[in-house]
């Protein structure tokens, strides 16, 4: 039965049938170079929220009213325009983020998905994720999103402590979060992710670990741990600056992270990325595209994208940012078909730096095969094999460089930022002194 108010098209109907099939974990191996150039992920930004959380500096707005029909039409238009511009033939995943996309109507989600499926091949079993806040996603509404084509949820739970939730400016309680999580697991079994924050002001290790243990009793097969970052311009930043709140203790945050990842490993979760943990093959296809430096298109106000504009004969990957403010973005989409505000061509070294920094965030790291897709002349051995600094990191057991490629050890993954302080300059030096060779496409 399809919930009322959800218009279904051909793709949405096929997607609902595909949701009943078992998931197959095929991540970890990069696609062939040919397919990589014709595939992309799609990010859709819904910029509106009910209120601004105290820690958040994302591009979001609290409007008096939203003309959703206009927003929907602009999202559809921009998706069509950028898909044609990119020349991609297949979209592997779609992620509705924000903002609070669970405030959008399921009809808007379905309209975007149908538009994508009309432009390119969107497999019926493609991962389609929706970020949801507990207060804006009761069970019937979640079911309506499922009927619209969503097959994976990412719930912004953040904490199971009501005092911490209040500090963060969240609109839900711990009981609200657990109720939404239970309803989501019934509707999307094996496809529900939750976020848990660490390193809050005055937060202690043991109470936080108790939260994590409690969450393990209720959660599904995917969990993300995020350390609080105090962002300038947020309420939380101001309170710490004024001395109203104590500054977060970085040593305690590091201890929480180390203890937390150990707890999750013991519970059968694979830490497949610095902040992300999965069991039973429930890795995020969409985020994996980011970490593997795959192409992705960003639509909606302030969305980011990275792709080669093959549709207009382009051969160089571009970093694109859409216009931030929703009303201005809609005006530009209406006039030009898209609201791209900034477009920067990525140099070859810039792209390789991203391949290295993003790839090392994963437990797979950067394989030789994957690296060669971006740089067929200069190998990982050429870049890192003769470096004394890298040799020292290998001896310390923080890095591994072998027949598989370059990757962090379990210990190294926890200190990746410090490792990159050695690895990125080494890449830059190797690039500067590389032998002359024909420049390959990016």
Swiss-Prot record:
Pfam families: HemN_C, Radical_SAM
Residue positions binding S-adenosyl-L-methionine 2: 99-100, 158, 170, 195
Keywords linked to the UniProt accession: 4Fe-4S, Chaperone, Heme, Iron, Iron-sulfur, Metal-binding, Mitochondrion, S-adenosyl-L-methionine, Transit peptide
Cell location: Mitochondrion
SMART domains for this protein: Elp3
One function term, GO molecular function aspect: metal ion binding
Presence of keyword Aminoacyl-tRNA synthetase: no
Superkingdom of this protein's organism: Eukaryota
Domain Radical SAM core: 34-270
Residues bound to [4Fe-4S] cluster: 49, 53, 56
Major localisation: mitochondrion
Cofactor requirement: [4Fe-4S] cluster
GO cellular component term of the entry, any: mitochondrion
GO biological process: porphyrin-containing compound biosynthetic process
Matching CDD domains: Radical_SAM
Transit peptide: 1-17
Residues given in the record as S-adenosyl-L-methionine 1 binding sites: 43, 98, 131
Gene3D superfamilies cross-referenced by the UniProt entry: Aldolase class I (3.20.20.70)
Family under the similarity heading: Belongs to the anaerobic coproporphyrinogen-III oxidase family. HemW subfamily.
Misc remark: Might carry two S-adenosyl-L-methionine binding sites with only one binding to the iron-sulfur cluster.
Role played: May be a heme chaperone, appears to bind heme. Homologous bacterial proteins do not have oxygen-independent coproporphyrinogen-III oxidase activity. Binds 1 [4Fe-4S] cluster. The cluster is coordinated with 3 cysteines and an exchangeable S-adenosyl-L-methionine.
Protein name as it appears in the record: Radical S-adenosyl methionine domain-containing protein 1, mitochondrial
Gene that produces this protein: Rsad1
